[in-house]
UniProtKB/Swiss-Prot annotation:
SUPFAM superfamilies: Nucleoside phosphorylase/phosphoribosyltransferase catalytic domain, Nucleoside phosphorylase/phosphoribosyltransferase N-terminal domain. It catalyses: N-(5-phospho-beta-D-ribosyl)anthranilate + diphosphate = 5-phospho-alpha-D-ribose 1-diphosphate + anthranilate. This is Anthranilate phosphoribosyltransferase. It comes from Glaesserella parasuis serovar 5 (strain SH0165) (Haemophilus parasuis). It is an enzyme of class 2 (transferase).
Length: 333
């Protein structure tokens, strides 16, 4: 089917199949849609909502076009959120990736510039002295040797540049925000994925199930694309294609709820200062709690089933200062 026909189907409120969406998104990545066509597509999808079939088709197109990364044969995971929750918190996922590596996990962190906060994962890591543009073979070596690497989305998904002017002009969340966490070029089968809206939990989980991930958590925590320290976290757990929905509270991790305001972030330099203090074991208790809760769930992907025990173990690792050593090693690649 021609691109124009596929566009017309979407504008007429018809859902595309996965293969149709893959074809259409391949056209976007190759720069074949003009700005008016792309705007119509993005806004129509946003208003009616993207189906799991459509998201999985777009993911397939993006991964097929991505620059290659040598996927490891050992167990590794990613922890990443859609962004776009407008909460402007510290970089919980990035800090959790570093702490997770200090706990002995293998984490290939996929990330980009900021979406809704002042500081995205790549902004923070740059401020911390990490080379976010390291070649794929060097990033893979870091993952092998220290258990952590960062894959900068713009380096691997070159075709996204064709959509940048339209996305900047629209100034609203689109399917591109939804795709980010699902298109890690390392292709992890284990992921902790945060979404900016509770309405995304179900389509995201169904997409993950279609993509054949081994074990994944999709979370939304009281307005955050993270596990929440301030209230309930809605969870979709996908294990070997089966989806289970439930909720978690800070008490499940052994903590009392803390105010969201305590996680407020700032510019990259400010966030880097706060995250460095955290990794040294000298950060705010609320920051340590947020990272402990998210890393505890991340550990469950590797078979550590008791999240309360995991959270305490993470706090011990944070206090030990091991995490800042992992960061220091990463800056040398």
């Amino acid at each position: 089917m021609q691109t124009e026909q596929l566009l017309l189907k979407i504008i007429e409120q018809t859902h595309l199949t996965s293969s149709e969406m893959q074809q259409l998104f391949t056209s976007i990545i190759q720069g074949e849609l003009n700005p008016i066509q792309l705007t119509a597509l993005l806004i129509t999808l946003k208003i009616r909502g993207e189906s799991a079939e459509e998201i999985s088709g777009a993911v397939a197109a993006c991964l097929n076009a991505a620059q290659p990364f040598p996927t490891p044969d050992y167990a590794f995971a990613d922890i990443v959120g859609t962004g776009g929750d407008s909460a402007n918190t510290i970089n919980i996922s990035t800090a959790s990736a570093i702490v997770g590596a200090a706990c002995g996990l293998k984490i290939a962190k996929h990330g980009n510039r900021s979406v809704s906060s002042k500081t995205g994962s790549s902004d923070l890591l740059t401020a911390l002295g990490v080379n976010i543009n390291m070649p794929a073979d060097i990033a893979r070596r870091a993952l092998d040797e220290i258990g952590l690497c960062f894959l900068f989305a713009q380096q691997y998904h070159l075709g996204f540049k064709h959509a940048v002017p339209v996305r900047q002009a629209l100034k609203t969340r689109t399917i591109f925000n939804i795709l980010g966490p699902l298109i890690n070029p390392a292709r992890p089968k284990r992921q902790l994925l945060g979404v900016y809206s509770p309405h995304l939990l179900k389509p995201y989980a169904e997409t993950v199930a279609q993509l054949g991930h081994q074990h994944t958590f999709v979370v939304h925590g009281c307005g955050l694309d993270e596990v929440a320290i301030h209230g309930r976290t809605d969870v979709a757990e996908i294990y070997d294609g089966k989806i289970t929905y439930y909720s978690l509270s800070p008490l499940d991790f052994g903590f009392q709820a803390k105010p969201l305001e305590s996680l407020r972030g700032g510019e990259p330099a400010e966030n880097a200062q706060m995250i460095t203090a955290l990794l040294q074991g000298q950060g705010k208790p609320e920051h340590a709690q947020a990272v402990a809760m998210n890393t505890a769930l991340l550990m469950k992907l590797f078979g550590y089933e008791n999240i309360k025990h995991n959270a305490q173990q993470v706090l011990d690792v944070i206090q030990s200062g091991k995490s800042v050593n992992v960061l220091s090693q990463l800056t040398r690649y």
